[in-house]
């Protein structure tokens, strides 16, 4: 396997959490950091270099310019204005679309041909704006989508069912935000219907929205209200996406993907199950949704599509 080169654009808490997770998992041999503040990028690179001395394998970390992206395998983009306490992700849209468009053009001009992973919020809209501005293929532009929401859901279910999160198959789909929903009809534990665990967990089809969907959707706000930002969880989740692509696992994970007729929608980037492999998103998986879930999915699509369309008219 050839040495992997990963570039981070945006050296804030989320980006640094991803890079630290990636380093400790040995995902790449070379890392580069681009930030609007070159001194900040240098400082983080120096700090990561110091950390690398304790790793059992050699790596390099340095500040990059956009011209250094040409032979990178991955770009992880976290740059954008941060979310404020009490502010929804969708309120960030106008400022962060402007930022991502500028980044997309610089990335394209560099000759980059690898895989772009977008994390900046509101991620569904920002990923779409990046894809449109860059012209890169759907396969190679991946949003973090509801990958963190799904991890939170799996953890919550595992805790109630007294099993490992690795034994839980469950998805949060739709917008990474307030209109996301739990695909309750698809939840399984070790391949068995979640309904078999209703007595143990106290959760069934009549109360899952209160017991699972609502707490999972509010988790980010609970963290932000207490410590102003979330970053370790999403950093680890992005490292998991990158790891699955590098290792060509063909694992099914939730990610932000551009729909081309799947689930009956076109052109919207949204959190859905996908197959991850060496080419990025190798397939979008259309799981069966019940009528209630289909309605929630359509509502989520409509919300992010309207905001995107309104935003690009005014930028």
From Swiss-Prot:
It comes from the Bacteria. Pathway: Fermentation; pyruvate fermentation to lactate; (S)-lactate from pyruvate: step 1/1. The active site is at residue 176. SUPFAM superfamilies: LDH C-terminal domain-like, NAD(P)-binding Rossmann-fold domains. GO terms for biological process: glycolytic process; lactate metabolic process. GO terms for molecular function: L-lactate dehydrogenase activity. The modification Phosphotyrosine is found at residue 221. The keyword Aminoacyl-tRNA synthetase does not apply. Coiled coil: none annotated. It catalyses: (S)-lactate + NAD(+) = pyruvate + NADH + H(+). NAD(+) binds at residues 14, 35, 66, 119-121, 144. Gene3D superfamilies: Lactate dehydrogenase/glycoside hydrolase, family 4, C-terminal (3.90.110.10), NAD(P)-binding Rossmann-like Domain (3.40.50.720). GO terms for cellular component: cytoplasm. Its EC number is 1.1.1.27. It is found in: Cytoplasm. Pfam families: Ldh_1_C, Ldh_1_N. Substrate binds at residues 83, 89, 121-124, 149-152, 230. The keyword Zinc does not apply. InterPro entries: L-lactate/malate_DH, L-lactate_DH, L-lactate_DH_AS, Lactate/malate_DH_C, Lactate/malate_DH_N, Lactate_DH/Glyco_Ohase_4_C, NAD(P)-bd_dom_sf. Keywords: Cytoplasm, NAD, Oxidoreductase, Phosphoprotein. Catalyzes the conversion of lactate to pyruvate. NCBIfam families: L-LDH-NAD. Belongs to the LDH/MDH superfamily. LDH family. Homotetramer. This is L-lactate dehydrogenase.
């Amino acid at each position: 396997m050839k040495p992997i080169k990963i570039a981070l654009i945006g050296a804030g808490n989320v980006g640094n959490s991803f890079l630290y997770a990636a380093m400790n998992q040995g995902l790449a041999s070379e890392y580069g950091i681009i930030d609007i503040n070159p001194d900040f990028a240098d400082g983080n690179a120096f700090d990561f270099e110091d950390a690398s001395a304790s790793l059992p394998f050699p790596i390099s970390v340095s500040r990059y310019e956009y011209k250094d992206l040409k032979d990178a395998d991955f770009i992880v983009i976290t740059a954008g204005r941060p979310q404020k306490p009490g502010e929804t992700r969708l309120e960030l849209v106008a400022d962060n679309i402007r930022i991502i468009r500028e980044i997309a053009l610089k990335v394209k001009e560099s000759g980059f041909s690898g895989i772009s992973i977008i994390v900046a919020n509101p991620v569904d809209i920002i990923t779409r704006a990046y894809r449109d501005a860059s012209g890169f293929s759907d396969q190679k532009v991946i949003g973090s989508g509801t990958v963190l929401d799904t991890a939170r859901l799996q953890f919550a279910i595992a805790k109630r069912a007294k099993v490992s999160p690795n034994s839980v198959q469950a998805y949060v789909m739709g917008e990474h935000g307030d209109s996301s929903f739990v695909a309750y009809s698809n939840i399984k534990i070790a391949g068995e219907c979640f309904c078999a665990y209703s007595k143990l967990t106290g959760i069934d089809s009549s109360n899952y929205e209160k017991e699972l969907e609502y707490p999972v959707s509010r988790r980010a706000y609970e963290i932000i209200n207490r410590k102003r930002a979330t970053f370790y969880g999403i950093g680890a989740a992005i490292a998991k996406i990158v790891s699955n692509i590098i290792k060509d696992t063909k694992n099914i994970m939730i990610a932000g993907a551009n729909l081309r007729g799947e689930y009956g929608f076109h052109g919207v980037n949204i959190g859905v199950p996908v197959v991850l492999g060496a080419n990025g998103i190798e397939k979008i998986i259309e799981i069966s949704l019940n009528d209630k879930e289909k309605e929630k999915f359509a509502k989520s699509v409509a919300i992010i599509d309207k905001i995107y369309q309104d935003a690009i008219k005014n930028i």
